[in-house]
C-alpha cells in the first residue's frame, strides 16, 4: 500500500468522522444531559439540509448571480437557528412531559420523526433534491500526490469551529456552566438554584441546532431527501455510547475512530461488512468497558 493511498484513506476517514461528529455532538448533549433517546434527531439533520436548499433557491430567484457564492455562509447559522427553534418547540410541547419515561419518550420522538419526514415529502416531494455548492468550494488542494477536496476541507474547518464554540459556551459562559452542572448532578444543581427546566430546553435546542449544521454540511457531499437523517442516526448513537454518554471529549475520539476504522476496513470488504465489523468491535469493547472510552469516575464507600 503506497503512502498516497494511506494518506488518502486517512483523510477520508477523518472527513467521515468529522461529519459523524457534527451529528453526534447534538445527540451527546440531549442524550447525555436529559437521558432522552431522541429518535427524531435525524430529522433535524434533514431540516438543516432543506433550510440550506430553500436559501439557495431564494438567492437564485431574487438576488444577482454575483451574490450566489455567499448563500452557504448564511445557510450555516440559519440552519442552526431553524433546527434549534423547532427543537425548542418539540421540547416544550412533547419531550418536557416525558422525562423519566424512556419508553414513552422513545415512542413519542419516533412519531415526531415520521411526522417531520411526511411533512418534508408534502412540501418538497419524495425525490431527492440537489444543492449546488458555491464556486469557491469546487476543486481541491493537491498535496503529496493526494487531492483534498475543498468541500471536505471546509467541513473539517466547520467541525473544528463548532467544537471550539461549544467548549467556549460550556466552560466560559454562565449558561454553559449551568448546563454542565445539570449534566454532572441534576439534583444538586437544582438545590443550588439552577432552573433545570430552562437548562433542559436550552440543551435540547442546542443539540437540535448542531444537527441542523450537520444537515447543512451534508448538502456539500450529496443530494438530500426526507430520509436523509436516517442514514446517520444509528452511527451517531454508536459514537455517543462508545465515547461515553454525555462525554463530549469521548464523543470526539469515538467519531474519529469510527470514521478512520470504517474507511480502512472498507478497502478490503464492502461498506455493509465494514459496518458489521465496527459494530461487533463496539459491542465487544463495551463488554469490557461499559462506561465507554471516557467513562464517569465515581467513588465507592467501603
Report each predicted region and the residues it spans.
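Alpha-helical transmembrane segments within multi-pass membrane transporters and channels
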Residues: 65-112, 119, 253-258, 289-290
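Membrane-interfacial amphipathic/re-entrant helices at transmembrane-helix boundaries
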Residues: 1-23, 51, 62-74, 101-106, ...
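Pore- or pathway-lining transmembrane helices of multi-pass membrane proteins that form conduits
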Residues: 43-50, 96-121, 229-241, 270-289
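Helix-loop-helix "hairpin" substructures at the membrane interface of multi-pass membrane proteins
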Residues: 147-224, 248-253
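Transmembrane helix-bundle core of multi-pass membrane transporters
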Residues: 97-98, 102-172, 199-202, 264, ...
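Cytosolic-side transmembrane-helix boundaries in multi-pass membrane proteins
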Residues: 123, 135, 184-191, 195-198, ...
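Inter-helical junctions in multi-pass inner-membrane proteins, predominant
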Residues: 2-11, 148, 169-174, 200-242, ...
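Single transmembrane alpha-helix segments in multi-pass membrane proteins
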Residues: 6-55, 89, 93-104, 244-245
Amino acid at each position: 500500500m503506497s503512502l498516497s493511498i494511506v494518506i488518502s484513506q486517512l483523510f477520508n476517514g477523518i472527513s467521515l468522522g468529522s461529519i459523524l461528529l457534527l451529528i453526534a455532538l447534538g445527540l451527546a448533549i440531549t442524550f447525555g444531559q436529559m437521558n432522552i433517546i431522541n429518535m427524531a434527531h435525524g430529522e433535524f439533520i434533514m431540516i438543516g439540509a432543506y433550510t440550506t436548499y430553500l436559501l439557495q433557491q431564494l438567492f437564485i430567484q431574487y438576488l444577482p448571480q454575483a451574490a450566489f457564492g455567499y448563500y452557504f455562509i448564511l445557510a450555516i447559522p440559519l440552519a442552526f437557528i431553524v433546527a434549534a427553534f423547532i427543537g425548542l418547540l418539540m421540547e416544550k410541547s412533547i419531550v418536557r412531559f416525558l422525562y423519566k419515561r424512556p419508553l414513552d419518550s422513545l415512542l413519542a420522538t419516533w412519531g415526531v420523526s415520521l411526522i417531520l419526514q411526511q411533512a418534508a415529502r408534502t412540501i418538497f416531494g419524495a425525490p431527492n433534491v440537489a444543492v449546488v455548492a458555491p464556486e469557491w468550494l469546487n476543486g481541491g488542494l493537491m498535496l503529496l500526490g493526494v487531492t483534498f477536496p475543498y468541500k471536505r476541507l471546509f467541513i473539517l474547518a466547520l467541525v473544528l469551529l463548532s467544537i471550539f464554540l461549544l467548549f467556549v459556551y460550556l466552560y466560559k459562559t454562565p449558561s454553559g456552566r449551568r448546563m454542565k452542572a445539570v449534566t454532572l448532578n441534576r439534583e444538586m444543581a437544582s438545590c443550588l438554584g439552577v432552573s433545570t427546566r430552562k437548562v433542559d430546553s436550552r440543551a435540547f435546542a442546542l443539540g437540535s441546532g448542531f444537527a441542523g449544521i450537520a444537515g447543512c454540511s451534508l448538502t456539500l457531499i450529496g443530494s438530500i431527501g426526507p430520509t436523509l437523517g436516517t442514514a446517520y442516526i444509528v452511527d451517531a448513537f454508536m459514537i455517543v455510547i462508545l465515547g461515553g454518554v454525555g462525554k463530549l471529549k469521548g464523543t470526539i475520539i469515538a467519531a474519529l475512530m469510527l470514521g478512520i476504522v470504517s474507511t480502512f476496513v472498507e478497502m478490503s470488504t464492502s461498506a455493509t461488512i465494514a459496518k458489521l465489523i465496527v459494530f461487533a468491535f463496539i459491542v465487544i469493547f463495551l463488554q469490557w468497558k461499559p462506561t465507554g472510552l471516557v467513562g464517569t469516575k465515581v467513588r465507592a464507600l467501603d
